[in-house]
Amino acid sequence: MTKVLIPSSGPNDWKGFLAQPDLHWRTGYSARSLAHCWEAASGLPIEVADIMAGAFGAPMLLFAVPEHKTMLPGGTRESQSDIFALVRHERGLASYTIEGKVEEPFGETVADWSRNASGGKIERLSYLCSMLGLAECAPEVRYQLLHRTVSALIEAERFNASFAGMIVHSFSPACRRFEDFALFVKLLGGGDIQPGQAVVIDTPSGRPLALGWACGDQSFLRA
């Protein structure tokens, strides 16, 4: 894949980067809602900026890349973040992975994903846990949350950023799937978390890691 990027001319440019455009690019679904929300913002959507500010101080978006792929050990399949954002704070650079949601689940639990695991899967899970300072991972945690969060740390290393973060940008009126996210945050030692709140945890790399659940403007569900 080329490393040359070109500016977006609008939300519809995002469609072509989806793994299954005809399936996922639909009104009321996260991919389309997320694209319209971020394109409408002057920089960062306010609900996302608030979480970033709560973690590391006032943020300024440098650039955002839809459907950004991050290589992981233990196989050839990358972690594909809905958005990768490089952000400047007064205290330094931060890399963020953004996971868009409406009603969609976070996918398999670690227990399901690792059942009859190949050597590659065992290697990958061990790597993900080590990056987050976990001796082992609770089987009920969603695997997607693990690799999406570690992707932010990998990109922070690549860009020599001081901080990293993973934010779920949800447009669900009922905050569907929040309980999966809250369980993940607690596993990492972040305690109890509420929507709209930032939690910052320490990581073995020495980079502080922010986690948050941003409640998106539901008008974008109609976009």
Give the residues covered by each predicted segment.
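Short coil/turn motifs at secondary-structure junctions
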Residues: 88, 103-105, 173
